[in-house]
Regions:
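Catalytic PLP-binding core of fold-type I/II PLP enzymes
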Residues: 102-141
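Active-site C-terminal subdomain of aminotransferase-like
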Residues: 149-187
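Catalytic cores of nucleotide-enabled group-transfer and carboxylate-activating enzymes in metabolic
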Residues: 20-27, 34, 38-42, 54, ...
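Active-site nucleophile and cofactor-binding loops and adjacent substrate-binding regions
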Residues: 12-18, 42-45, 148, 153
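PLP-dependent aminotransferase-class I/II
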Residues: 15, 41-101, 107
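Short loop-beta-helix segment that forms the pyridoxal 5′-phosphate
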Residues: 2-23
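Generic beta-strand/beta-sheet core signal
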Residues: 42, 67-69, 91-96, 118-123, ...
Length: 187
């Protein structure tokens, strides 16, 4: 997953892609210690992902989830650029989007980072064999559904949500991390 997304760290998976997407919002909320409570979601994000994010945060009165009402040209993300501000914790896009379109995310990444917000890219892992990686666009987190990697469907499942991020976010990352390291003695 790290090779496909260009990220430094990946966890040992979530229940599904929508759960991984919602966990990215949890990470962003903790990253800003609850001071930034605005989530900007592209209207071309998968509706199940959007609904899972809303379900995760339905008990929070002060979380603002915006982006549904924004129209315009997907190719430029200009309308999303206008609603990213200093209260924004996270900017969420899907790549390719829910309609299968491929957009240049460079301007959106620059705007998100100019406002110190995190950029999350929900992606199809198969498409990343041909497209630029989320890290190439400057994404802080990449997540999505791992089922397209060859998991056969059986009575509505199984699915797995992948979640990868930059090294700076590893301490706030949900899930198990599996890896190899050295102990205090260097062994």
């Amino acid at each position: 997953i790290c090779s496909l997304t260009g990220m430094a760290v990946s966890n040992a998976s979530h229940y599904d892609g929508a759960t991984a997407a919602a966990e990215a919002c949890v990470l962003a909320l903790h990253n800003f210690r609850g001071k930034r409570k605005k989530f900007v979601l592209s209207r071309y994000l998968h509706p199940h992902y959007r609904q899972t994010i809303k379900t995760y945060f339905q008990g929070y009165d002060d979380i603002i989830i915006t982006g549904d009402e924004v129209g315009g040209d997907l190719q430029s993300h200009e309308d999303l650029l206008d609603i990213v501000d200093t209260d924004t914790a996270i900017v969420y896009v899907q790549y390719p989007d829910f309609l299968g379109r491929i957009a240049d995310l460079t301007a959106l990444a620059e705007t998100a980072h100019a406002h110190k917000a995190l950029l999350v890219v929900v992606c199809n892992p198969i498409s990343l064999g041909m497209l630029k990686t989320p890290a190439d666009y400057g994404a802080d987190i990449a997540c999505g559904e791992g089922q397209p990697l060859g998991i056969p469907l059986n009575f509505g499942g199984p699915y797995l949500g992948f979640f990868a991020c930059k090294q700076e976010q590893v301490r706030r990352m949900a899930g198990r991390l599996v890896g190899q390291t050295l102990d205090a003695r260097g062994e």
